[in-house]
Amino acid sequence: RSLMKDLPYLRTDQHGNPAGPHVILLSGSSWAEGSYEYHVNRPVNYILEADAEKRVFLEKTRFFESGFLERISGAGDDQRVAQLRAATQKAVDLIISEYERKAGKILLVVNSYAQALEVQQTLETALRKANCSAHTCRMIADAINAPSGEDTVRRGEVSRFAQMNADILIAPAMAIERGHNIVDEYGHSALSAVFFMV
């Protein structure tokens, strides 16, 4: 980021003003004031707006709290897995409802790769019990020495989830947070619902 920000100062005029090369930074996720990792500390000069029809579509996005009392983050190690299983069981009807809408794929966000495995196992059992044909896939670390299959996808290959047969992706928050585009053949998000299991 520093190289990109300071590249215009490679050459300066007689007054010390940048003379190029010129740089345009385009990102929808580089304004995170206070973050040394993500923030580009330069003033925003322009904002690109989506087409009116896309803005209208996005305005229809619904956010809601499940009302479940289970909290995974902050729970003791001995309770965390039980809380995660309970939250997954309670979310099954909501997940099935989203799956049956056939609006797109579903993302479940968890706190770790271990939790992704736990949720996948719990959810697969619950889906079969409910006679739901949805299939799950969980993200695995790139460093894992095992091939990805239909029920796993490596972090570095997660963009291919859009083309996989699986309907539900389970991924850790820190692994999916930035730089991953899960899009259909038209460049639109392949995801229709996101559940935060945290």
Where in the sequence are the language-model features?
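ASCE RecA-like P-loop NTPase motor cores
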Residues: 1-198
